Amino acid sequence: MKENIEEAVKKAVSEAPPRGFKESVDLAINLHNIDLTQPGNRVDTEVILPHGRGRPNRIAVFAAGDTALKAKAAGADYVISPEELKLLGENRKNARKLADEYDFFIAETQFMPVIGKTLGPILGKRGKMPTPLPPNADVAQMISRLKNIVRIRSRDRPTFHIAVGRRDMDARQLAENIESVITKLEQTLKDGRRNLKSVYVKTTMGPAVRVI
């Protein structure tokens, strides 16, 4: 399968005119034979891309004390203190901006109830509720894992998109990223491959090329 995917990637990139910005490479996933009005049938999962998506995910961490220091040392893009959390709960505009700026959130478990109450509607709508960080858990390991993860969410729509890399990445690396996504979908969907109507690969502004 990898060779076929790689050929599709090469075709999608070669047929896309050069742009004045770094285009992402995206998958368009089309599902069928599955009732997405039932929440239990919807896709809401994560997959680690073996070669990342061309840039590390931006990670924000709700933490205090020693955990906050460890998160900063581990490369967290932003560490949110309890005081800042309180202010975000009082300013929805800033909360929405934060939700859009960062790809993933981590939170010490002690802050989860407050986050759910004050920021839940904003983060939840975007599929960005924080990953809980239990006491004594390794925040550095969690940050490292999230750097190359993509979230796969169908919601209630049969067609959805996933960024799997950048146009300037090697075609084989992109193919391996795509293969990881397809494998994860097959494992997640109720009837596996039978629920995949089609998968297309394309650059941000380029034509779509069928993968399966």
From Swiss-Prot:
The keyword Oxidoreductase does not apply. It comes from the Archaea. InterPro entries: Ribosomal_uL1, Ribosomal_uL1-like, Ribosomal_uL1/biogenesis, Ribosomal_uL1_3-a/b-sand, Ribosomal_uL1_arc, Ribosomal_uL1_CS. Keywords: Repressor, Ribonucleoprotein, Ribosomal protein, RNA-binding, rRNA-binding, Translation regulation, tRNA-binding. One of its GO terms (cellular component) is large ribosomal subunit. GO terms for molecular function: rRNA binding; structural constituent of ribosome; tRNA binding. Pfam families: Ribosomal_L1. GO terms for biological process: regulation of translation; translation. Belongs to the universal ribosomal protein uL1 family. PANTHER family: 54S RIBOSOMAL PROTEIN L1, MITOCHONDRIAL (PTHR36427), LARGE RIBOSOMAL SUBUNIT PROTEIN UL1M (PTHR36427:SF3). Binds directly to 23S rRNA. Probably involved in E site tRNA release. Protein L1 is also a translational repressor protein, it controls the translation of its operon by binding to its mRNA. Part of the 50S ribosomal subunit. This is Large ribosomal subunit protein uL1. It comes from Methanothrix thermoacetophila (strain DSM 6194 / JCM 14653 / NBRC 101360 / PT) (Methanosaeta thermophila).
